[in-house]
Regions:
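N-terminal amphipathic/hydrophobic targeting modules at extreme N-termini
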Residues: 2, 6-12, 16-17, 25
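Polybasic, lysine-rich low-complexity intrinsically disordered segments
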Residues: 4, 30-33
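Short, often N-terminal, low-complexity regions
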Residues: 24, 34-37
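Compositionally biased, intrinsically disordered low-complexity regions enriched in proline and serine
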Residues: 9, 15-16, 32, 118, ...
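Coiled-coil-like amphipathic alpha-helices with heptad-repeat character
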Residues: 1, 21-27, 64
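Domain-level signature for soluble enzymes in the chorismate/prephenate branch of the shikimate pathway
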Residues: 37-401
Length: 401
């Protein structure tokens, strides 16, 4: 009996030891995992702090170098001012952007590099001179966005009510430069801008391409909107989306996409179509993005100034002319022959009534090259002999800003 009791006690103790070992093993495993996690976290946190310290050190160098660059740019601006040279030079900027693209080995994309340096150059110009950029307003139009894309956010911008006002403000010196739309990939030419290029003495010094993405803004949900306001072109460019999503809504054309958003009020059942910039500036909720029917909707804008700029090496140029042809058979063919014989690439021909007499037209021609390049001067001389009007509108970088 005693032996059986001792055996039973032994078995209980032995079983308890086994359970204790199992429990101990689990606890040790848990401790090892915790220890491993703590070690990994400590190492990774140490690496993170080290990398942050490296970034801080790099930032310190960047700030010093940026200020050195700006100081050099300001000195250039002072010399330009003494020489009577314009502070803004899009061709020189294109040289800078091209050089940066060659230097950039990644991972930063070239578009990002261009955007960063666009702002660096803008800040430098702002310290050189208080430039004023006029544009077709109101604030937050696509023209405003194109102007900021071209000049950067640091300069002063002045919204103007109509395209003629932009030309007039630049002509009289109230604005240093003007930005106006010239054509859209779906709607065609902006005729008022074409007319004013002929009627005024301003010259084209740059072009800007802006991909137009329409958004729907409203203080109410899409299914509650009963009226949509926007510029007539924007309403047309979103026609299919509107018919599909707001078939009963009344479409109201007004003078500006930005104005449509600006006029929206909380509690109303109105919507407005405009670019994202308008929603940000006027603080109106976005109900739908990218509602345009065609995704390749691009508007081209021109930057106009009082003075033309000199040609620079390493920059691909586009030149714009306006011609008026004599009333003879084959007049247009003969004019275009001057370009083809010298291998000059025409990239645009646009006709527009001259408004001088019935059935008389101006021909707006764009071609690749600068007015001062070899061969192009000869073309211009030939055109002057065969055309009743040859007006140079500007040579400017072909690469869009």
């Amino acid at each position: 009996m005693d032996e059986k009791l001792r055996l039973h006690e032994f078995m209980e103790i032995y079983y308890g030891l086994i359970l204790f070992e199992i429990k101990l093993d689990k606890e040790l495993r848990k401790q090892r995992i915790s220890s491993s996690f703590a070690t990994t976290f400590f190492v990774e946190n140490k690496n993170l702090e080290s990398l942050r310290g490296e970034i801080d050190a790099i930032d310190s160098q960047i700030v010093v170098l940026l200020n050195q660059r700006v100081q050099a740019a300001v000195e250039i601006g002072r010399i330009k001012s003494e020489l009577g040279v314009d502070p803004y030079d899009p061709a020189r900027e294109e040289q800078v952007f091209n050089k940066l693209e060659d230097l950039n080995k990644g991972p930063l994309h070239k578009e990002s590099m261009r955007t960063i340096y666009r702002e660096v150059i803008s800040a430098s110009i702002a310290l050189e001179k208080n430039l004023v950029i006029g544009y077709l307003g109101p604030e937050a139009t696509y023209t405003h966005q194109a102007a900021v894309n071209n000049f950067g956010s640091t300069l002063k911008y002045r919204p103007l009510p109509d395209i003629p006002d932009v030309f007039e403000a630049v002509e009289c010196g109230e604005c240093d430069y003007g930005v106006v739309p010239i054509e859209n990939s779906t709607e065609g030419a902006v005729n008022r801008s074409l007319d004013l290029l002929v009627e005024t003495e301003l010259t084209i010094i740059a072009q800007v391409f802006l991909e137009v993405e329409h958004s729907l803004f409203s203080f109410c949900k899409v299914d509650e909107i009963d009226e949509v306001h926007s510029k007539d072109q924007a309403l047309a460019q979103c026609g299919e989306w509107l018919r599909r999503n707001l078939p009963k809504a009344r479409l109201v054309p007004i003078t500006s996409t930005a104005e449509a958003v600006k006029n929206l009020e909380p509690g109303s059942t109105f919507g407005a179509i405009a670019g994202k910039m308008a929603g940000r500036i006027y603080d109106v909720p976005t109900q739908a993005d990218a509602i345009q029917d065609r995704k390749n909707n691009v508007t081209r804008f021109l930057v106009v100034a009082r003075n033309a700029l000199p040609q620079r090496d390493g920059v691909r140029y586009r030149t714009s002319l306006v011609l008026s042809l004599s009333d003879k058979i084959g007049a247009l063919k003969n004019a275009l022959k001057s370009f083809s014989e010298r291998g000059i690439n025409l990239c645009k021909i646009e006709s527009r009534p001259s408004r001088l007499k019935a059935w008389d037209y101006y021909f707006f021609i764009d071609f690749i090259g600068h007015r001062d390049e070899e061969g192009i001067g000869e073309v211009l001389k030939e055109l002057e002999q065969t055309c009743t009007l040859v007006k140079f509108l500007g040579s400017y970088p072909e690469e869009p800003s």
